[in-house]
């Protein structure tokens, strides 16, 4: 089996899994979704471990088990942001390393806050997704695998709109000329791209600082940097963006903000310039890097280093997923301004 054939089989399996998960979530009564639980992917529990998440996980695992059997290749599923893994199928030879976030944004569909018997508090904004990323078969140790080794990625929109204004279910596939990103719909597949605009002052930036305040994982100064970054980005008169957006559950917003179509007679481009994330986690990075690259974008850390060469063993970092090289350079300059001036200047 060629790499292209294998990658296609993997992407198709992930699309089927994501769409079945979407159906499961919408079919489950809201009052049943939020029961606290533990699962293979979330063995420690926590506010993101809910009954709906565990049920969706079972769906995803079943699809991965069938995929491993059909390909005759083992799958090593990353757990706990790469600190552990769960083997699926064969245990010998090269294996596919995979990441699966069955509901990116669990609390949006399962409820947030103290539980009550007669009510559930949902976000109701539709902003969640099922996300997957896969390497081609490899024997490399987990810690040495680079983000760019994840050649296949799929993000399935949790609430696709009836009248699509943006690419919804998206996938990245490897190719001889590099990755390519596609929208998958009932009408077939279409290439999707980031914007060609280089005018940051006419584009939106999504700034995610949620994890800058995570005391277990943040770096010293992340909290202050996040405030300074907002000040640097929102100032559209001196090199900032047109405006700054925020959405919890980044992967559901990736296609909505960054991707559009380049089809005659008129290209429909996104107004999104970039995602800027302080202290991003691996389950978000692994699908985002190939999807952004395949659409013509650029993914770097806050020091300008390409994310594609970053190894799993290096863990979290702060990132920029930019529409193009020019936008990336402008945003790196904003990062430097935030670092040098501090939050209140």
Q: Locations of the language-model features?
A:
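An extended, acidic
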Residues: 14, 21, 25, 154-161, ...
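DPxDG-like acidic metal-binding loop motif
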Residues: 91-176
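N-terminal subdomain of lithium-sensitive/metallo-dependent phosphomonoesterases centered on the IMPase/IPPase/PAP
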Residues: 1-104, 109-112, 333, 340-345
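Short, conserved micro-motifs enriched in small and acidic residues
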Residues: 47-55, 124, 248-251, 282-286
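Alpha-helix capping and helix-coil boundary motifs
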Residues: 2-5, 9, 44, 48, ...
């Amino acid at each position: 089996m060629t790499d292209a054939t294998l990658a296609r089989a993997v992407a198709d399996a992930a699309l089927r899994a994501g769409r079945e998960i979407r159906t499961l979530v919408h079919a489950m009564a809201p009052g049943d979704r939020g029961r606290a639980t533990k699962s293979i992917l979330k063995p420690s529990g926590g506010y993101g471990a809910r009954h709906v998440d565990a049920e969706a996980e079972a769906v995803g695992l079943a699809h991965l088990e069938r995929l491993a059997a059909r390909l005759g290749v083992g799958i090593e599923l990353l757990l706990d942001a790469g600190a552990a893994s769960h083997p699926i199928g064969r245990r010998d030879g090269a294996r596919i390393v995979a990441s699966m976030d069955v509901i990116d944004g669990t609390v949006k569909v399962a409820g947030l806050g103290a539980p009550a018997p007669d009510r559930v508090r949902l976000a109701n904004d539709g902003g969640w997704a099922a996300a997957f990323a896969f390497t081609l078969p490899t024997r490399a140790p987990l810690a040495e695998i680079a983000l760019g080794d994840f050649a296949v990625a799929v993000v399935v929109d949790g609430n696709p709109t009836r009248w699509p204004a943006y690419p919804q279910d998206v996938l990245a596939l490897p190719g001889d000329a590099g990755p390519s990103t596609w929208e998958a719909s009932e009408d077939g597949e279409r290439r999707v791209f980031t914007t060609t605009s280089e005018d940051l002052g006419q584009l939106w930036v999504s700034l995610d600082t949620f994890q800058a305040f995570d005391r277990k994982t943040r770096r010293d100064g992340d909290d202050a940097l996040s405030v300074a970054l907002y000040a640097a980005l929102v100032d559209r008169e001196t090199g900032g963006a047109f405006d700054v957006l925020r959405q919890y559950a980044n992967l559901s917003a990736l296609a909505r903000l960054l991707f559009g179509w380049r089809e005659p007679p008129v290209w429909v481009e996104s107004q999104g310039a970039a995602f800027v994330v302080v202290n991003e986690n691996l389950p978000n990075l692994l699908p985002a890097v190939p999807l952004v690259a395949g659409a013509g974008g650029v993914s770097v850390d806050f020091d300008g280093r390409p994310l594609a060469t970053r190894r799993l063993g290096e863990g979290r970092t702060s990132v920029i997923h930019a529409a193009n090289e020019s936008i990336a350079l402008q945003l790196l300059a904003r990062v430097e301004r935030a670092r040098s001036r501090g939050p209140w200047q």
